[in-house]
C-alpha cells in the first residue's frame, strides 16, 4: 500500500465511498510519567471505535494510523491480523458492509517534535505536560481515523491520566472515577493509579481540529454571557491554561478581555452564535505554530506569556492571534474546506478577521498599520518566490499541504479579502459570510460555495474577480506618473501597473491615490485624495487633474489593495529627505514597506535603506513599525549590503542604535526596542563591554530595566563574539533554570565562535534526533551567526550531502526546520548558488516539498546577490 503521504486523489476516492457517523477514542496516558525504559519510543495506549457507512458494500478502503505497533483490529466483529492489515501508516479495510464498525487497539508514540501528542518535561520542577497538535494530518499519530478534512464526524473522547492531572478536550469534560489497573503499554509495568476523564460529544468536526491537553496545568476560569435580540441567552465557560512555572507571569485577565471583546464582535457581525460550548485557551510548551483553532480548546505557543517587559506590539500580536483563532470557530471549524486546495477559505479569512476585529473591538486601533507593515511583507516575499502559487492552490498531497501554510495562504489571502471588502462593500461581504455559515454549517466547501453567496449579496460577478485575485499568482507594481502643466498644477496623473513576466496578470485594483505636500513647519501632509479603479497597464486618475503639484504621490494610500508601491522620482527624492515628516502613521508605514521592497528588488541600495533607518526611525511613533524597521535594517546589512561595506554599515547601525537608546524616554517601550536592536548590532569591543556592564550592574542607562529576557538578549552577542563562555552561560541558566532559560542557553551555546562548537551543534541537529523541536530550533538559531561566515563555510557541502537523508528519516516539521534553517545563506557567493543548482539538477526525483524548500532558499540567495551588486555599484559611484 502507499505510504503516509495521502494524495488528493486518494482522499477524494475515499470521501466518495465513505461517510463517518461517529468516533469514540480512548487514550491511556498514565505512561507519560515515570522513568523511561530507553527501549524504543515511550508509548501510550489508544483504542478507537469508528462507525461509518460505505455506499458500495464489498469495496475496500483504508484507515490512517502512524504508530509503533497495533495490538488488535476488529472490523464488524471480525478480528483481523494486525501484521497483515497494518503497514505502519494505513490499516487495510476489505469487504466493507453498508454499515461498519472498526475497532483499533494501538500503541502510539509520544512526540518530541510537536506533532501528534507532544510530551514535555519541565526542567524547573520535573512536571510532565501533554498536548496535541495535528494540522494538517497528525491526529493519526494519536488515534486511528480517516485523516482528511471532509470526513467530519462527532467525537467522544475518554482519557485515563495520572491521578493528580487535569485533562481537557474539545467538549466539556468531567472526571468520573479513579482507576488502578495494569498498564499494557511500554514503560508502564505494574499498576498505577489514575483518573478517567470523559468528554461530551462534539459537533461534527474534522480530525485535525480534535484536541487533548493533559497535565498539572495552572488554570484560570471566567465566563462570557450574551443576550441576543430575540431574548435567547448564551453562556460560554472560559478557561486559560499554562504551565505552573509560568503562572506568576500569566496575565489571564487580558487574555479574557480580548476573548470577550472578540466574541462580542463576531456575534455582532456573524449572526451565528458560537457553536462549540466552552472556550478554553491553553498556552503550551515547545509549540511549533503560533496557535491552533481546535474548537473549544485553542492551543497557543507559551511565548505569548511574557516573562519580561515587552512592547505594546507584543500584546497587539497576541490579541491578533487570539482573534484569528476565534474567527476560525466559524471560518474553518463550523465550515471547513473540502481539501487543502481551499485552505485559504479558513486561513485567509481568519487572518483578515484578526485585524478587522482587532481594530473594531479592542484597544489596538492601529492594527491595520501592523497589517500593512508586517503581514504584507510576509506576503510580498512569498509571492515572489519560485514556489508562489494562487491563493487557491494546487495541493497534491499532505506534504504540499504542510508547506502551504505560508505567506500566500495567510497574508496575501487576507490582503485580497481586504481588497474584496473595498470591491463589494463591507455590508455585502459580511452578509455573504452570514449566509455562508447558515448554508454550510458543519459541512465542507469549495471556492464556488463562497463566491455564490457573495454574488447574491453584492450583485457583482465574482467569477472574473476570483480568476484575477484567487486563481493567479504574483504581485503587481503600481507606479504614479505625474505630468505638470505650465501653471505648475497637475495636468495628468496616471497609475502604471506592471507584472512579472512569469505571472503577467494585470488585476483590477480599487485604490486610493494620495497627494502630499510639505508644510511651512516641515510636516508632510495629505492635501488631496481620490479613490479609483485601476485596470490594465495604465489608468488616468482624472479626479486629481488640476490639483497643486505634489511633493509625494502615494499610490494605494490607506492600503486598500495588495500591490508593491513604487514612486516617481520627485516622490522618492522627497522621502529621502523628509520621510520623518509624514504625519500619518499608516502612510508612513506604507512608505517604509515600499522602500524595503525596493531594497529587496535591488532598486534601492542597501546602504541607502540603512541610512534612512538611521535618519528617520528615531521619529517613528508606532512601536510595531519601529521594530520591523530594526529587523529590516539588520537584514539589509546581513544579506543585501556589499560585503566590503558591511563593517562600515554595522558600525553605523550600532552607533545609531546606541544614540537612540540613550535619547529614548527612560522606561519607555521605544527605549526597550532600541536596547534590543543595539544588542543585535553590537560587535565593537566598547559595545560589548557596555552590554557586559549592563548585565553585571557596572553600567546603567536611566530607565532601562535589564530583566531576565533582556539579559539573554544581551548574552547572545556576547557569546557570538567570544566574550561569554560556557561557564558564563551555565551561571545564567542557574539564575533562570526554566524551560525558557534552557532554550536561551542552548541558542547562546551554539552561537559561540568555535569550530568545535559548530561541529557539536551540527551533530545534535543533523545527525541525531535527541533534541526536542524547541531545542532544534534554538540550536539552529544560534548556529548561523552573520559574524561567523568563515567559520560556517565548511558546512555548505555538508548541508547538500545531508538534507535528503534528513528529509527521509525525520518528521516533516524537523525536516523543514533543518532544510530552511541550515541553508548556507551566509555563504552568499556565486559558488553557493552553483552548489545549490548542482544539487537541484542531481536530485530531480527528490520529494517535491524538499525541492520547494531548496528552491525558495536559492531564490533568497540570488536576490541577496543582486542586492549586493546594486549596493556595490552605489558605493562605486559615490566613491
Where on the chain are the PLM-derived regions?
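N-terminal, polar/Ser/Thr-rich
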Residues: 1-45, 123-129, 149, 463-464
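Surface-exposed beta-strand/loop patches in extracellular or lumenal glycoproteins
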Residues: 49-67, 156-162, 448, 493-514
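A surface-exposed beta-strand-loop module
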Residues: 55, 61, 65-124, 147, ...
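Beta-strand-rich binding/interaction modules
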Residues: 69-76, 462-463, 475-556
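Extended, low-hydrophobicity, Ser/Thr/Pro/Gly-biased non-transmembrane segments
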Residues: 107-225, 394, 584-593
